[in-house]
């Protein structure tokens, strides 16, 4: 909502999981309805719907939020088997910024290498992140979503917002 309030023209893209999995955070129908309400657009829900993002080049930047460990791993290894991953691949062919808002319980575990690969990739920028609960979940990393807008602004200048590592107090 804050992004829309700041004047952004948002094209929502949903992963297969977000379209189908009910969780403690809510159900897919609720999310789709809220996304339509905020963006005033139908979300992109398929790989074929996401592919034209490349040739049409209509996005200034693309943000993946939340970016799960699974999505980060697939992105780092060039796998494009969801609408979000196809959108990222298609968008990046235009040398425009991709902003990642990480949210994974495995960021300092098996996924650390994937986050490292993405941090070292051209045109990929991270919303600053930190350990949200280092005692109960020592490998968990979560982005500071309140820094999404300044991260996007810096990414549009092809700069990483700093510091990229930020404590949760």
What are these regions (language model features)?
Residues 1-82, 86-98, 105-169:
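A cross-family phosphate/adenosyl-ligand binding-site feature
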